[in-house]
Design a protein with these regions (language model features):
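Conserved C-terminal alpha-helix-loop-beta "cap" of PLP-dependent enzymes
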Residues: 299-454, 458-463
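Short, glycine-/Ser/Thr-/acidic-enriched flexible segments
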Residues: 27, 169, 223-225, 240-242, ...
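Charge-dense polyanion-binding interfaces
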Residues: 467-475
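Conserved N-terminal alpha-helix of the aminotransferase class I/II PLP-enzyme fold
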Residues: 34-79
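N-terminal "arm"/small-domain region of PLP-dependent enzymes with the aminotransferase-like
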Residues: 1-52, 188
Protein backbone atom coordinates (compact mmCIF):
# COMPACT_ATOMS: atom_id res chain seq x y z
CA UNK A 1 0.00 0.00 0.00
CA UNK A 2 1.27 3.47 -0.87
CA UNK A 3 2.36 6.07 1.68
CA UNK A 4 1.95 9.36 -0.22
CA UNK A 5 2.38 11.69 2.76
CA UNK A 6 5.51 9.94 4.05
CA UNK A 7 7.01 9.84 0.56
CA UNK A 8 6.40 13.53 -0.13
CA UNK A 9 7.85 14.71 3.18
CA UNK A 10 10.93 12.49 2.91
CA UNK A 11 11.63 13.74 -0.60
CA UNK A 12 11.25 17.33 0.54
CA UNK A 13 13.53 16.80 3.54
CA UNK A 14 16.22 15.36 1.28
CA UNK A 15 15.89 18.03 -1.44
CA UNK A 16 17.98 20.71 0.23
CA UNK A 17 15.27 23.30 -0.39
CA UNK A 18 15.66 26.48 1.68
CA UNK A 19 12.80 26.49 4.18
CA UNK A 20 11.55 30.05 3.94
CA UNK A 21 8.27 29.06 5.58
CA UNK A 22 7.02 27.79 8.94
CA UNK A 23 7.83 26.11 11.30
CA UNK A 24 10.59 28.10 12.92
CA UNK A 25 12.97 25.20 13.55
CA UNK A 26 13.62 25.03 9.76
CA UNK A 27 14.20 21.30 9.90
CA UNK A 28 17.16 21.60 12.26
CA UNK A 29 17.20 18.84 14.83
CA UNK A 30 16.44 19.58 18.44
CA UNK A 31 14.51 16.37 19.09
CA UNK A 32 15.41 14.54 15.89
CA UNK A 33 12.05 14.69 14.12
CA UNK A 34 12.29 18.26 12.81
CA UNK A 35 13.37 17.44 9.21
CA UNK A 36 9.97 15.77 8.68
CA UNK A 37 7.90 18.45 10.42
CA UNK A 38 6.50 20.73 7.72
CA UNK A 39 3.50 22.92 6.99
CA UNK A 40 1.10 23.24 4.04
CA UNK A 41 3.69 23.98 1.37
CA UNK A 42 2.92 23.38 -2.31
CA UNK A 43 2.32 19.68 -2.85
CA UNK A 44 1.73 18.92 0.83
CA UNK A 45 -2.07 19.23 0.47
CA UNK A 46 -4.37 20.71 3.15
CA UNK A 47 -6.11 18.52 5.71
CA UNK A 48 -9.46 20.31 5.59
CA UNK A 49 -9.45 20.81 1.80
CA UNK A 50 -7.69 17.59 0.87
CA UNK A 51 -7.27 16.90 -2.84
CA UNK A 52 -3.73 15.51 -3.07
CA UNK A 53 -1.52 13.33 -0.89
CA UNK A 54 -3.75 13.58 2.19
CA UNK A 55 -6.82 12.62 0.16
CA UNK A 56 -4.88 9.68 -1.31
CA UNK A 57 -3.81 8.50 2.13
CA UNK A 58 -7.33 8.84 3.53
CA UNK A 59 -8.59 6.79 0.58
CA UNK A 60 -6.16 4.05 1.64
CA UNK A 61 -7.51 4.22 5.19
CA UNK A 62 -11.08 4.12 3.88
CA UNK A 63 -10.36 0.87 2.06
CA UNK A 64 -8.63 -0.64 5.09
CA UNK A 65 -11.45 0.22 7.49
CA UNK A 66 -14.19 -0.65 5.00
CA UNK A 67 -16.09 2.59 5.58
CA UNK A 68 -17.99 4.96 3.34
CA UNK A 69 -15.26 7.50 4.09
CA UNK A 70 -12.52 7.80 6.69
CA UNK A 71 -11.09 11.21 7.60
CA UNK A 72 -7.91 11.99 9.53
CA UNK A 73 -7.60 14.02 12.70
CA UNK A 74 -4.35 15.21 14.26
CA UNK A 75 -6.14 16.30 17.43
CA UNK A 76 -7.40 13.00 18.73
CA UNK A 77 -10.89 11.62 19.04
CA UNK A 78 -11.88 14.78 20.94
CA UNK A 79 -11.94 16.68 17.65
CA UNK A 80 -13.76 13.82 15.94
CA UNK A 81 -16.40 13.61 18.68
CA UNK A 82 -17.26 17.29 18.25
CA UNK A 83 -17.37 16.98 14.46
CA UNK A 84 -19.47 13.80 14.66
CA UNK A 85 -22.05 15.52 16.84
CA UNK A 86 -22.05 18.60 14.64
CA UNK A 87 -22.77 16.44 11.58
CA UNK A 88 -25.53 14.55 13.38
CA UNK A 89 -27.15 17.87 14.28
CA UNK A 90 -26.89 19.08 10.70
CA UNK A 91 -28.45 15.88 9.40
CA UNK A 92 -31.38 15.81 11.83
CA UNK A 93 -34.89 16.92 10.84
CA UNK A 94 -35.85 20.38 12.04
CA UNK A 95 -38.51 20.16 14.75
CA UNK A 96 -38.53 23.65 16.24
CA UNK A 97 -37.52 22.19 19.61
CA UNK A 98 -34.19 22.15 21.39
CA UNK A 99 -32.06 19.31 20.02
CA UNK A 100 -31.47 16.42 22.40
CA UNK A 101 -28.88 13.64 22.37
CA UNK A 102 -29.44 10.29 24.08
CA UNK A 103 -26.09 9.29 25.59
CA UNK A 104 -24.63 6.67 27.91
CA UNK A 105 -23.46 8.36 31.11
CA UNK A 106 -19.82 7.16 30.92
CA UNK A 107 -19.04 9.69 28.20
CA UNK A 108 -15.73 11.50 27.82
CA UNK A 109 -15.83 15.17 28.76
CA UNK A 110 -15.38 16.01 25.05
CA UNK A 111 -19.10 15.31 24.74
CA UNK A 112 -19.88 18.04 27.28
CA UNK A 113 -17.63 20.50 25.51
CA UNK A 114 -19.48 19.71 22.27
CA UNK A 115 -22.84 20.24 23.99
CA UNK A 116 -21.62 23.63 25.24
CA UNK A 117 -20.37 24.73 21.85
CA UNK A 118 -23.26 23.32 19.79
CA UNK A 119 -25.95 24.03 22.44
CA UNK A 120 -27.88 20.78 22.70
CA UNK A 121 -29.44 18.93 25.61
CA UNK A 122 -28.39 15.48 26.78
CA UNK A 123 -30.74 12.80 28.07
CA UNK A 124 -28.61 10.30 29.97
CA UNK A 125 -28.75 6.52 29.77
CA UNK A 126 -27.80 5.10 33.17
CA UNK A 127 -26.77 1.49 33.79
CA UNK A 128 -29.18 -0.89 35.48
CA UNK A 129 -28.62 -1.11 39.26
CA UNK A 130 -27.03 -4.55 38.95
CA UNK A 131 -24.55 -3.22 36.35
CA UNK A 132 -23.50 -0.04 38.11
CA UNK A 133 -20.57 0.55 40.45
CA UNK A 134 -17.75 1.99 38.32
CA UNK A 135 -17.36 5.47 36.86
CA UNK A 136 -16.01 4.15 33.56
CA UNK A 137 -18.77 1.61 32.85
CA UNK A 138 -22.32 2.04 31.60
CA UNK A 139 -23.70 -1.10 29.95
CA UNK A 140 -26.75 -0.26 27.84
CA UNK A 141 -29.29 -2.98 27.11
CA UNK A 142 -31.60 -3.17 24.11
CA UNK A 143 -34.57 -2.80 26.43
CA UNK A 144 -33.14 0.26 28.16
CA UNK A 145 -32.41 1.98 24.86
CA UNK A 146 -35.82 1.10 23.41
CA UNK A 147 -37.56 2.40 26.53
CA UNK A 148 -35.60 5.66 26.49
CA UNK A 149 -36.38 6.28 22.82
CA UNK A 150 -40.06 5.54 23.38
CA UNK A 151 -40.18 7.87 26.39
CA UNK A 152 -38.70 10.69 24.34
CA UNK A 153 -41.15 9.99 21.52
CA UNK A 154 -43.98 10.21 24.04
CA UNK A 155 -42.72 13.69 24.91
CA UNK A 156 -42.73 14.66 21.25
CA UNK A 157 -38.94 14.62 21.01
CA UNK A 158 -36.68 12.61 18.73
CA UNK A 159 -32.97 12.62 19.59
CA UNK A 160 -30.62 13.63 16.83
CA UNK A 161 -28.44 10.68 17.79
CA UNK A 162 -27.68 7.93 20.28
CA UNK A 163 -24.15 8.22 21.67
CA UNK A 164 -22.27 5.29 23.18
CA UNK A 165 -18.71 4.73 24.39
CA UNK A 166 -17.45 1.31 23.35
CA UNK A 167 -14.96 0.02 24.38
CA UNK A 168 -15.01 1.83 27.69
CA UNK A 169 -11.94 2.58 29.80
CA UNK A 170 -12.17 -0.72 31.68
CA UNK A 171 -12.50 -2.74 28.48
CA UNK A 172 -16.25 -3.30 28.52
CA UNK A 173 -17.99 -3.35 25.14
CA UNK A 174 -21.56 -2.56 24.18
CA UNK A 175 -23.61 -4.87 21.93
CA UNK A 176 -23.30 -2.49 19.01
CA UNK A 177 -25.05 -4.78 16.51
CA UNK A 178 -28.16 -5.13 18.67
CA UNK A 179 -28.22 -1.48 19.74
CA UNK A 180 -27.75 -0.25 16.16
CA UNK A 181 -30.81 -2.28 15.16
CA UNK A 182 -32.84 -0.43 17.81
CA UNK A 183 -31.56 2.90 16.48
CA UNK A 184 -32.46 1.90 12.92
CA UNK A 185 -35.98 1.00 14.01
CA UNK A 186 -36.38 4.52 15.42
CA UNK A 187 -34.58 6.24 12.50
CA UNK A 188 -31.92 7.64 14.82
CA UNK A 189 -28.19 7.45 13.95
CA UNK A 190 -25.91 5.54 16.31
CA UNK A 191 -22.74 7.50 17.13
CA UNK A 192 -19.92 5.60 18.82
CA UNK A 193 -16.86 6.82 20.68
CA UNK A 194 -14.57 3.95 19.67
CA UNK A 195 -11.42 5.77 20.76
CA UNK A 196 -10.02 2.63 22.40
CA UNK A 197 -10.95 0.26 19.58
CA UNK A 198 -9.27 1.22 16.30
CA UNK A 199 -7.67 -2.23 16.14
CA UNK A 200 -11.04 -4.03 16.37
CA UNK A 201 -11.46 -3.79 12.59
CA UNK A 202 -8.36 -5.91 11.99
CA UNK A 203 -8.85 -9.00 14.15
CA UNK A 204 -8.55 -12.06 11.89
CA UNK A 205 -11.39 -13.79 13.74
CA UNK A 206 -13.83 -11.14 12.51
CA UNK A 207 -14.23 -7.40 12.82
CA UNK A 208 -15.74 -6.01 16.00
CA UNK A 209 -15.52 -2.44 14.73
CA UNK A 210 -18.63 -0.26 15.24
CA UNK A 211 -19.06 0.60 11.56
CA UNK A 212 -19.08 -3.09 10.63
CA UNK A 213 -21.63 -3.69 13.40
CA UNK A 214 -24.06 -1.04 12.18
CA UNK A 215 -23.01 2.30 13.68
CA UNK A 216 -23.67 5.34 11.50
CA UNK A 217 -20.53 7.25 12.55
CA UNK A 218 -17.68 6.57 14.94
CA UNK A 219 -14.30 7.91 15.94
CA UNK A 220 -11.12 5.93 16.63
CA UNK A 221 -7.96 7.11 18.35
CA UNK A 222 -5.36 5.40 16.24
CA UNK A 223 -2.71 6.46 18.74
CA UNK A 224 -4.32 4.49 21.58
CA UNK A 225 -4.04 0.98 20.13
CA UNK A 226 -2.19 1.26 16.80
CA UNK A 227 1.40 2.40 16.14
CA UNK A 228 0.42 6.03 15.54
CA UNK A 229 1.75 9.21 17.16
CA UNK A 230 -0.29 10.79 19.95
CA UNK A 231 -3.17 12.77 18.47
CA UNK A 232 -3.61 10.61 15.38
CA UNK A 233 -7.28 9.68 15.02
CA UNK A 234 -9.98 8.76 12.51
CA UNK A 235 -13.52 9.94 11.87
CA UNK A 236 -15.35 7.06 10.17
CA UNK A 237 -18.58 7.48 8.24
CA UNK A 238 -20.64 4.38 7.54
CA UNK A 239 -23.34 4.09 4.88
CA UNK A 240 -25.94 5.20 7.46
CA UNK A 241 -24.16 8.46 8.34
CA UNK A 242 -26.68 11.33 8.28
CA UNK A 243 -24.29 13.52 6.27
CA UNK A 244 -22.02 12.20 3.52
CA UNK A 245 -21.01 15.38 1.66
CA UNK A 246 -17.21 15.55 1.89
CA UNK A 247 -16.95 19.32 2.11
CA UNK A 248 -19.50 19.37 4.95
CA UNK A 249 -17.54 16.76 6.89
CA UNK A 250 -14.25 18.57 6.43
CA UNK A 251 -15.86 21.84 7.49
CA UNK A 252 -17.13 20.18 10.67
CA UNK A 253 -13.63 18.93 11.47
CA UNK A 254 -12.14 22.34 10.66
CA UNK A 255 -14.61 24.00 13.01
CA UNK A 256 -12.97 22.23 15.96
CA UNK A 257 -9.40 21.87 14.70
CA UNK A 258 -6.24 23.89 14.35
CA UNK A 259 -5.31 25.38 10.99
CA UNK A 260 -1.82 24.00 11.66
CA UNK A 261 -2.28 20.21 11.73
CA UNK A 262 0.79 18.19 12.58
CA UNK A 263 2.44 16.62 9.54
CA UNK A 264 4.34 14.30 11.86
CA UNK A 265 1.01 12.86 13.00
CA UNK A 266 -0.29 12.72 9.44
CA UNK A 267 2.80 10.76 8.41
CA UNK A 268 2.27 8.29 11.22
CA UNK A 269 -1.34 7.72 10.13
CA UNK A 270 -0.11 7.28 6.57
CA UNK A 271 2.63 4.82 7.56
CA UNK A 272 0.16 2.87 9.69
CA UNK A 273 -1.91 2.16 6.58
CA UNK A 274 0.96 0.23 5.05
CA UNK A 275 1.53 -1.68 8.27
CA UNK A 276 -2.13 -2.65 8.53
CA UNK A 277 -2.06 -3.93 4.95
CA UNK A 278 0.70 -6.43 5.80
CA UNK A 279 0.82 -9.06 8.55
CA UNK A 280 -0.12 -6.69 11.37
CA UNK A 281 -3.60 -8.21 11.85
CA UNK A 282 -1.93 -11.54 12.60
CA UNK A 283 0.30 -9.80 15.12
CA UNK A 284 -2.77 -8.23 16.73
CA UNK A 285 -4.36 -11.65 17.09
CA UNK A 286 -1.16 -13.06 18.56
CA UNK A 287 -1.13 -10.26 21.14
CA UNK A 288 -4.77 -10.95 22.03
CA UNK A 289 -4.06 -14.67 22.37
CA UNK A 290 -1.08 -14.06 24.65
CA UNK A 291 -3.19 -11.75 26.80
CA UNK A 292 -5.96 -14.35 27.04
CA UNK A 293 -3.42 -16.89 28.28
CA UNK A 294 -2.00 -14.33 30.73
CA UNK A 295 -5.46 -13.62 32.15
CA UNK A 296 -5.98 -17.32 32.77
CA UNK A 297 -2.60 -17.66 34.50
CA UNK A 298 -3.17 -14.59 36.67
CA UNK A 299 -6.58 -15.82 37.76
CA UNK A 300 -5.13 -19.24 38.56
CA UNK A 301 -2.35 -17.55 40.53
CA UNK A 302 -4.83 -15.52 42.58
CA UNK A 303 -7.15 -18.49 43.08
CA UNK A 304 -4.25 -20.51 44.48
CA UNK A 305 -3.99 -17.87 47.20
CA UNK A 306 -7.64 -18.35 48.06
CA UNK A 307 -8.93 -15.08 46.64
CA UNK A 308 -12.68 -14.77 46.36
CA UNK A 309 -12.48 -12.59 43.26
CA UNK A 310 -10.83 -13.13 39.86
CA UNK A 311 -7.77 -10.93 39.46
CA UNK A 312 -8.11 -10.32 35.71
CA UNK A 313 -11.51 -9.35 34.33
CA UNK A 314 -12.34 -11.83 31.60
CA UNK A 315 -15.35 -12.47 29.38
CA UNK A 316 -16.01 -12.85 25.63
CA UNK A 317 -17.77 -9.48 25.60
CA UNK A 318 -14.68 -7.62 26.78
CA UNK A 319 -12.09 -5.84 24.68
CA UNK A 320 -9.35 -8.43 23.98
CA UNK A 321 -6.25 -6.20 23.99
CA UNK A 322 -6.77 -4.52 27.35
CA UNK A 323 -5.83 -6.13 30.66
CA UNK A 324 -7.99 -4.90 33.54
CA UNK A 325 -7.10 -6.10 37.03
CA UNK A 326 -9.43 -6.08 40.02
CA UNK A 327 -7.00 -4.98 42.72
CA UNK A 328 -9.55 -5.93 45.37
CA UNK A 329 -8.69 -9.56 44.64
CA UNK A 330 -5.30 -8.82 46.19
CA UNK A 331 -6.68 -6.78 49.06
CA UNK A 332 -5.47 -3.56 47.44
CA UNK A 333 -6.81 -0.48 45.73
CA UNK A 334 -6.09 0.07 42.08
CA UNK A 335 -3.80 2.96 42.99
CA UNK A 336 -1.80 0.83 45.45
CA UNK A 337 -1.37 -1.91 42.86
CA UNK A 338 -0.23 0.70 40.33
CA UNK A 339 2.39 1.90 42.82
CA UNK A 340 3.67 -1.66 43.27
CA UNK A 341 4.05 -2.09 39.51
CA UNK A 342 5.69 1.32 39.23
CA UNK A 343 8.28 0.25 41.79
CA UNK A 344 8.96 -2.72 39.54
CA UNK A 345 9.52 -0.63 36.43
CA UNK A 346 6.02 -0.63 34.91
CA UNK A 347 3.67 2.28 34.29
CA UNK A 348 -0.05 1.57 33.96
CA UNK A 349 -2.67 3.37 31.87
CA UNK A 350 -5.25 4.03 34.59
CA UNK A 351 -5.95 3.22 38.22
CA UNK A 352 -8.97 3.98 40.37
CA UNK A 353 -10.12 2.88 43.83
CA UNK A 354 -10.67 -0.66 42.58
CA UNK A 355 -9.37 -1.31 39.07
CA UNK A 356 -6.06 -1.11 37.23
CA UNK A 357 -5.96 -0.85 33.44
CA UNK A 358 -2.95 -2.04 31.44
CA UNK A 359 -2.81 -1.55 27.68
CA UNK A 360 -0.78 -3.86 25.45
CA UNK A 361 -0.18 -3.87 21.69
CA UNK A 362 2.03 -5.96 19.40
CA UNK A 363 4.72 -3.34 19.98
CA UNK A 364 5.17 -4.52 23.58
CA UNK A 365 8.02 -7.05 23.77
CA UNK A 366 7.17 -10.40 25.35
CA UNK A 367 9.32 -9.37 28.30
CA UNK A 368 6.68 -6.83 29.35
CA UNK A 369 4.10 -9.52 30.02
CA UNK A 370 6.71 -11.66 31.77
CA UNK A 371 7.73 -8.74 33.99
CA UNK A 372 4.11 -8.06 34.91
CA UNK A 373 3.42 -11.70 35.71
CA UNK A 374 6.55 -11.93 37.85
CA UNK A 375 5.65 -8.80 39.82
CA UNK A 376 2.14 -10.06 40.51
CA UNK A 377 3.45 -13.52 41.44
CA UNK A 378 5.87 -11.90 43.88
CA UNK A 379 2.99 -9.94 45.39
CA UNK A 380 0.90 -13.09 45.79
CA UNK A 381 3.84 -14.97 47.30
CA UNK A 382 3.90 -12.49 50.18
CA UNK A 383 0.46 -13.74 51.07
CA UNK A 384 -2.70 -11.78 50.56
CA UNK A 385 -3.71 -10.27 53.90
CA UNK A 386 -7.30 -10.60 55.02
CA UNK A 387 -9.09 -7.55 53.76
CA UNK A 388 -12.46 -5.98 54.08
CA UNK A 389 -14.68 -6.47 51.04
CA UNK A 390 -13.93 -3.83 48.39
CA UNK A 391 -15.86 -0.63 48.75
CA UNK A 392 -19.10 -1.02 46.83
CA UNK A 393 -20.22 2.16 45.13
CA UNK A 394 -23.27 0.56 43.52
CA UNK A 395 -25.77 2.26 45.81
CA UNK A 396 -23.92 5.56 45.53
CA UNK A 397 -24.03 5.49 41.72
CA UNK A 398 -27.73 4.59 41.86
CA UNK A 399 -28.26 7.56 44.15
CA UNK A 400 -26.28 9.76 41.76
CA UNK A 401 -28.68 8.84 38.97
CA UNK A 402 -31.65 9.78 41.15
CA UNK A 403 -30.06 13.05 42.31
CA UNK A 404 -28.77 14.23 38.91
CA UNK A 405 -30.96 17.31 38.57
CA UNK A 406 -30.20 19.66 35.66
CA UNK A 407 -30.60 23.28 36.76
CA UNK A 408 -29.00 24.89 33.69
CA UNK A 409 -28.23 23.74 30.16
CA UNK A 410 -24.68 22.56 29.58
CA UNK A 411 -23.97 25.70 27.55
CA UNK A 412 -25.36 28.03 30.21
CA UNK A 413 -23.28 26.38 32.92
CA UNK A 414 -20.04 26.25 30.94
CA UNK A 415 -20.19 29.92 29.95
CA UNK A 416 -21.51 31.27 33.25
CA UNK A 417 -19.24 33.10 35.70
CA UNK A 418 -17.73 30.41 37.89
CA UNK A 419 -15.45 29.71 40.80
CA UNK A 420 -13.41 26.74 41.99
CA UNK A 421 -14.17 25.48 45.49
CA UNK A 422 -13.25 22.43 47.61
CA UNK A 423 -15.28 19.42 46.49
CA UNK A 424 -16.50 18.80 50.02
CA UNK A 425 -18.11 22.25 50.08
CA UNK A 426 -20.00 21.87 46.82
CA UNK A 427 -23.28 20.40 48.06
CA UNK A 428 -26.20 22.11 46.35
CA UNK A 429 -24.03 24.08 43.93
CA UNK A 430 -24.36 23.86 40.14
CA UNK A 431 -21.48 22.24 38.27
CA UNK A 432 -19.84 24.53 35.71
CA UNK A 433 -16.89 22.95 33.92
CA UNK A 434 -16.34 19.33 34.98
CA UNK A 435 -13.15 18.90 36.97
CA UNK A 436 -11.81 15.50 35.98
CA UNK A 437 -8.38 14.16 35.20
CA UNK A 438 -7.49 12.35 32.01
CA UNK A 439 -7.55 9.41 32.22
CA UNK A 440 -10.42 8.74 32.37
CA UNK A 441 -11.87 12.24 31.67
CA UNK A 442 -15.35 11.01 32.67
CA UNK A 443 -17.19 13.50 34.89
CA UNK A 444 -19.04 12.42 38.02
CA UNK A 445 -21.35 15.43 37.73
CA UNK A 446 -21.92 17.15 34.41
CA UNK A 447 -22.20 20.84 33.62
CA UNK A 448 -25.54 22.30 34.69
CA UNK A 449 -26.36 19.63 37.28
CA UNK A 450 -26.85 20.28 40.98
CA UNK A 451 -24.16 18.57 43.06
CA UNK A 452 -25.86 16.21 45.51
CA UNK A 453 -24.74 14.01 48.43
CA UNK A 454 -23.93 11.02 46.21
CA UNK A 455 -21.64 13.18 44.09
CA UNK A 456 -19.75 14.31 47.19
CA UNK A 457 -19.21 10.69 48.21
CA UNK A 458 -17.91 9.81 44.75
CA UNK A 459 -15.68 12.90 44.64
CA UNK A 460 -13.98 11.57 47.78
CA UNK A 461 -13.73 8.02 46.43
CA UNK A 462 -12.18 9.11 43.13
CA UNK A 463 -9.87 11.73 44.60
CA UNK A 464 -11.63 14.81 43.22
CA UNK A 465 -10.47 17.65 45.48
CA UNK A 466 -11.90 20.74 43.79
CA UNK A 467 -14.85 21.47 41.52
CA UNK A 468 -15.79 24.37 39.30
CA UNK A 469 -19.26 25.72 40.13
CA UNK A 470 -21.48 28.49 38.83
CA UNK A 471 -21.44 31.63 40.95
CA UNK A 472 -24.81 31.60 42.71
CA UNK A 473 -25.79 35.18 41.96
CA UNK A 474 -25.54 34.56 38.22
CA UNK A 475 -28.69 32.47 37.72
Amino acid sequence: MTTPIVDFVRQYAQSGTARLHMPGHKGQSLLGCEPWDITEIRGADELYEAEGIIAQSEANATRLFGTAHTYYSTEGSSQCIRAMLCLALQGAPRTGKRPVLLAARNAHKALLYAAALLDFDIRWLWPAPEDTGALCSCPVTVQALSTALEELAGQGRTPFGVYLTSPDYLGGMQDIAALSAVCDAHSVPLLVDNAHGAYLRFLPGGSRHPIDLGAAVCCDSGHKTLPVLTGGAYLHLGPKAPVQEESTVRNALALFGSTSPSYLILQSLDACNRLLSTDYPARLQECCDRLAALRARLNALAAAQGTALPLALDSPAREPMKLTLDAAALGLTGQALADHLRQNGMECEYADPRYLVLMFTPENPAEDMARLEAALAELCARGIPPAEPPAEHRETFCALARQAEPRLTVRQAVFAPQETIPAGSALGRVCALPTVSCPPAIPIVVSGEVIGPAALELFAAYGVETVSVVKPEKF
